[in-house]
Amino acid sequence: MEKVISIVGAGGKTTLVHKLAREYHRSGKGVLVTTTTHMYVEADTDLSCDFFALRDKIIKDGYCMAGHKISEQKISEQSKPKMCGLPYDLLDKLIKDMPQALDYVIIEADGAKHHSLKYPAADEPVIYPLTTDVIIVLGTWEKGKLCKD
């Protein structure tokens, strides 16, 4: 395991998550993408939360986007389905048990809910405890404007 990268902020987190994942994967690294909150489900996302299925996918493909399904009621309210992140105990096990196959875990951490900025609070951003690097994404479209609630 080289790094566990958590990406927080607004205006481009998902794009950055996928760009980093593609670049690391292209360079021959094993990559797992997940979230600590909610994230849109992409094609070929594994929602099984099954250690062996995730392990096999990472070993076979060198890449896996994984999480668990949000309840059907919440999914139906979205135009595109969203997922929650992997349970921390499962993520811990994948990191611990796959040191040769899993090089990078890239986590879309807490977001700003379509605002350009969100102040940190006691319980946010939601950052995975084994994170080695945090990247803060800030949209510049509101540069120069006052921050308010």
What positions do the PLM features span?
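Walker A (P-loop) phosphate-binding motif
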Residues: 1-27
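General beta-strand structural signal in soluble alpha/beta enzymes
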Residues: 7-8, 31-35, 65-68, 104-109, ...
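N-terminal phosphate/diphosphate-binding loop that engages ATP/GTP or pyrophosphate donors
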Residues: 21-73, 77, 81
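A generic local secondary-structure boundary/capping motif
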Residues: 21-22, 55, 91-96, 121-127
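Conserved nucleotide-binding/hydrolysis micro-motifs of P-loop NTPases
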Residues: 38-39, 71, 111-113, 140-143
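Phosphate-binding/switch loop-helix module in NTP-utilizing enzymes
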Residues: 69-119
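A short secondary-structure junction signal
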Residues: 116-121, 145-149
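Inter-motif core of Ras-like GTPase G domains
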Residues: 121-143
